[in-house]
């Protein structure tokens, strides 16, 4: 039933709710799965990718190259962070999209300023700190995998010098040649995260 009216079940559903996936949305997805509706990227896959740390943990258990990552909470022990992750470092909120909640910190002063700003705004949430992969600053690859097969690749590239390559932040997308490494990494990521697409 939708708004009290009986409706025919869809043949399939491809949830595209991203970081906005709420408990309510997940409950609907699980309900439809249990009714036999085919889900493209079902509830398990959504659980795997909605939380950036959880995704990182899944990928980190494999032989895939992943950046060193820490989960921290307020108050943050700066010395402990610096022992494990060198500057520059990337700081992220656990969920988010379009480059929001992602910051590059180049030194201890910037780190302390960002943490102070978080404290002043009562942002006492957990954050991820990652090593900066300097070769990828301002660009990243997006690999399209469908049912385990790599079918396309694009490079997102910042055009204004930002370290983030998000299209919504003014970046551009250009076709990118698939090689063996890209095919293997893309396919493995999709497999490990249980993604259909």
Question: Which functions belong to the PLM regions below?
Answer:
Residues 14-15:
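Redox-cofactor binding/interface segments in oxidoreductases and associated redox assembly factors
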Residues 18-20, 95-96:
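Short glycine-rich anion-binding loops that position phosphate/pyrophosphate groups of nucleotides
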Residues 28, 78, 186:
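Aromatic/hydrophobic pocket-lining residues that form π-stacking "cages" and hydrophobic walls in ligand
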Residues 194-196:
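Phosphate/ribose-recognition catalytic cores of enzymes acting on nucleotide-derived substrates
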Residues 4-8, 32-36, 40, 44-138:
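Active-site nucleotide/adenylate-binding loops and adjacent lid/helix of ATP-dependent enzymes
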Residues 103-189:
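Phosphate-binding site of ATP-dependent enzymes
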Residues 1-9, 21-22:
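Glycine-rich, highly charged phosphate/nucleotide-binding loops
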Residues 25-31:
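A short acidic, amphipathic alpha-helical/loop segment
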């Amino acid at each position: 039933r939708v708004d009290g009216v009986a409706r025919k079940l869809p043949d399939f559903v491809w949830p595209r709710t991203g970081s906005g996936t709420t408990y309510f949305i997940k409950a609907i997805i699980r309900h439809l799965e249990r009714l036999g509706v085919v889900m493209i990227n079902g509830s398990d896959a959504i659980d795997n990718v909605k939380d950036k740390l959880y995704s990182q943990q899944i990928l980190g258990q494999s032989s895939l190259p992943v950046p060193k990552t820490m989960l921290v909470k307020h108050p943050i022990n700066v010395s402990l962070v610096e022992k494990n992750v060198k500057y520059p470092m990337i700081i992220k909120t656990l969920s988010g999209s379009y480059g929001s909640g992602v910051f590059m910190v180049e030194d201890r002063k910037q780190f302390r300023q960002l943490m102070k700003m978080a404290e002043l705004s009562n942002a006492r949430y957990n954050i991820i700190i990652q090593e900066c992969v300097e070769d990828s600053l301002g660009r990243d690859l997006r690999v399209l995998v469908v049912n385990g097969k790599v079918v396309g690749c694009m490079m997102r590239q910042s055009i204004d010098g930002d370290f983030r390559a998000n299209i919504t932040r003014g970046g551009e997308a250009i076709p990118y040649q698939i090689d063996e490494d890209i095919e293997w990494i893309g396919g493995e990521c999709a497999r490990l995260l249980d993604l259909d697409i």
